[in-house]
From Swiss-Prot:
An annotated GO BP: photosynthesis
Keywords associated with the record: Chloroplast, Membrane, Photosynthesis, Plastid, Repeat, Thylakoid, TPR repeat
HAMAP family recorded: Ycf3
Gene: ycf3
Known function: Essential for the assembly of the photosystem I (PSI) complex. May act as a chaperone-like factor to guide the assembly of the PSI subunits.
Membrane topology note: Peripheral membrane protein
Major location category of this protein: plastid
Organism the protein comes from: Chara vulgaris (Common stonewort)
Annotated InterPro entries: PSI_Ycf3_assembly (IPR022818), TPR-like_helical_dom_sf (IPR011990), TPR_rpt (IPR019734), Ycf3/AcsC/BcsC/TPR_MFPF (IPR051685)
Name by which UniProt lists this protein: Photosystem I assembly protein Ycf3
Source species, domain of life: Eukaryota
Alphabetized NCBIfam families for the sequence: PRK02603.1 (NF002725)
One Pfam family in the UniProt entry: TPR_1
């Protein structure tokens, strides 16, 4: 039984029901339906902190999914898991793959910026001022792209850009 059919909370159950209805109404192939089921199960596992299970589901969804736009969200979520696990280099790989397929994904730009900013902070702690400036400048560029795509979001990033004179 797919994980999505075992959900106990109201929101997950509602989402599952609506998604199932849409999958019946909208013409989709069996492969697309399977890919979506794995994606949905991955999101459910991820929300519960079951990252290994989520990754298994996302990898299976990637194997089945052929649409670049849909694949971008799977890749983005894989990046989120690696970020949560502190695997920033791996997370960046997945965020960049997501952006290759969908350059209108502001949350991926934001997360890349957050990792760059974090690395800038680490460089400061190591007394490496030149590296910190480079990381912060990279963070600024990615935040600018995220803000351009979603102007009402990322207020803290907008403030940081203003305070640091990068906007």
């Amino acid at each position: 039984m797919p994980r999505s059919q075992k959900n106990d909370n109201f929101i997950d159950k509602t989402f599952t029901i609506i998604a199932d209805i849409l999958l019946r109404i909208v013409p989709t192939s069996q492969r697309e339906r399977e890919a979506f089921t794995y994606y949905r199960d991955g999101m459910s596992a991820q929300a519960e902190g079951e990252y290994a299970e989520a990754l298994q589901n996302y990898y299976e969804a990637m194997r089945l999914e052929i649409d670049p736009y849909d694949r971008s969200y799977i890749l983005y979520n894989i990046g989120l898991i690696h970020t949560s696990n502190g695997e920033h280099a791996k997370a960046l790989e997945y965020y960049f793959q997501a952006l290759e397929r969908n350059p209108s994904l502001p949350q991926a730009f934001n997360n890349v910026a957050v990792i760059c900013h974090y690395r800038g902070e680490q460089a400061i702690q190591q007394q490496d001022i030149e590296s910190s400036k480079a990381w912060f400048n990279q963070a600024a560029e990615y935040w600018k792209q995220a803000i351009q795509l979603a102007p009402g979001n990322y207020i803290e990033a907008q403030n940081w850009l203003k305070i640091t004179g990068r906007i």
